[in-house]
């Protein structure tokens, strides 16, 4: 049976140094160039393009992150300024309210004092008038009593 395998082979078998070995070497080199041209270069190009895309995407992302951070700090500053301005407006409104309250209280107090003073003057006037009337009636009554007493004598 071993002779059956060697039927087509010559004396040296597979390791004969005839034209087969250089032909195989040429086939390997040719296959390498073909694979390089058809497979490795396109795949390498796709990998490089993908790497460039990833690098540019990463650079754009870093740039956008920097822009977002800048906008965030600007917005925080604006928010802080708005809060300070709102506090200032609230404080001014409180002061205005306090001033209006004090003015209204002073006006009400002065009006109450004026009204009380007017009422006191009216009462004094009416009292003086009543006293004068009482005095004149007392004088009249005294005169009447004197006249009656003198008339009886």
Swiss-Prot record:
F(1)F(0) ATP synthase produces ATP from ADP in the presence of a proton or sodium gradient. F-type ATPases consist of two structural domains, F(1) containing the extramembraneous catalytic core and F(0) containing the membrane proton channel, linked together by a central stalk and a peripheral stalk. During catalysis, ATP synthesis in the catalytic domain of F(1) is coupled via a rotary mechanism of the central stalk subunits to proton translocation. Component of the F(0) channel, it forms part of the peripheral stalk, linking F(1) to F(0). The b'-subunit is a diverged and duplicated form of b found in plants and photosynthetic bacteria. It comes from the Bacteria. It comes from Prochlorococcus marinus (strain NATL1A). Belongs to the ATPase B chain family. The keyword Transmembrane applies. This is ATP synthase subunit b'. Keywords: ATP synthesis, CF(0), Hydrogen ion transport, Ion transport, Membrane, Thylakoid, Transmembrane, Transmembrane helix, Transport. It is found in: Cellular thylakoid membrane. NCBIfam families: PRK07353.1 (NF005607). One of its GO terms (cellular component) is plasma membrane-derived thylakoid membrane. F-type ATPases have 2 components, F(1) - the catalytic core - and F(0) - the membrane proton channel. F(1) has five subunits: alpha(3), beta(3), gamma(1), delta(1), epsilon(1). F(0) has four main subunits: a(1), b(1), b'(1) and c(10-14). The alpha and beta chains form an alternating ring which encloses part of the gamma chain. F(1) is attached to F(0) by a central stalk formed by the gamma and epsilon chains, while a peripheral stalk is formed by the delta, b and b' chains. Its main location: membrane. Pfam families: ATP-synt_B. GO terms for molecular function: proton-transporting ATP synthase activity, rotational mechanism; proton-transporting ATPase activity, rotational mechanism. The chain crosses the membrane at residues 20-40. CDD domains: ATP-synt_Fo_b. Disulfide bonds: none annotated. InterPro entries: ATP_synth_b (IPR034679), ATP_synth_B-like_membr_sf (IPR028987), ATP_synth_b/b'su_bac/chlpt (IPR002146), ATP_synthase_B_chain (IPR050059). The keyword Ion transport applies. SUPFAM superfamilies: F1F0 ATP synthase subunit B, membrane domain (SSF81573). It is a single-pass membrane protein.
